Amino acid sequence: GCTGDPARRAGNEYLFHMLASANTETFKEQGVRKVVTHCPHCLNSLKNDYPEFGATLEVIHHSELLQKLIEEGKIVPQQKAEENVVFHDSCYLGRHNEIYDAPREVLNASTTSSPIKEIEQSRETGTCCGAGGACFLLEENTGTRMSHHRLDELMVNEPDTIAVSCPFCVLMLEDAVKAKNLNVQVKDISEMLVKKN
C-alpha cells in the first residue's frame, strides 16, 4: 500500500498516521528489515518519518541498488545509449536525503555520453519539478508552472533524454514536454539500462 506521503504533504496528518501505523505493523508482522523503493517520496517517508511509528527499516532507493549491482557486475547495461542525457535531481532523493551520486553512476554506466552533462541547477541547487508538497494533485491556474520552468532549465544543453529517479518527476516533466511540444524523452534511470528495439 501507500506510505501515506502524499497525504502528509497535502496536510492530511490523520490519514498519514493511519497508513504509517498500519504499514509499520505489517512490516513487524512480516519481519521486514529492508525496503527498496522506486519513489524518493516513499524513501523519505519510510526512512525519516516512519521511525516515529516504531519502524526500524533499512531503506534504499532503486538507484542505490542498481549502482551496487552494476559495480558487482550483476547488471551489465545491454546497450550503451548514444544519447545526450541530462539528469533531474528529485527533491526527496537529493536535497532531502543527499543521494546524488548513485543515479549518476547508473546513467554513466548506461550511456555513451558519460559523464552525463550537468546543468547549473543540479544537485544541491536543483529546482523542483513541481510535484513536491503534493502539488501534482493540484491544478495550477496562474503564472508559470514549476514543471515548465524546470523543463526550460533542463533543456539548456538540448538533451535527447531527461533522466529522472522519481515517478512523480516523470509525470510532471512528461506533461511539460507535451504542453511545450518538445522532442525530448523523459525516462527513469532504470529504463536507461534496457536495450532498445
Give residue ranges: language-model regions.
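Iron-sulfur cluster-binding electron-transfer modules in prokaryotic oxidoreductases
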Residues: 1-197
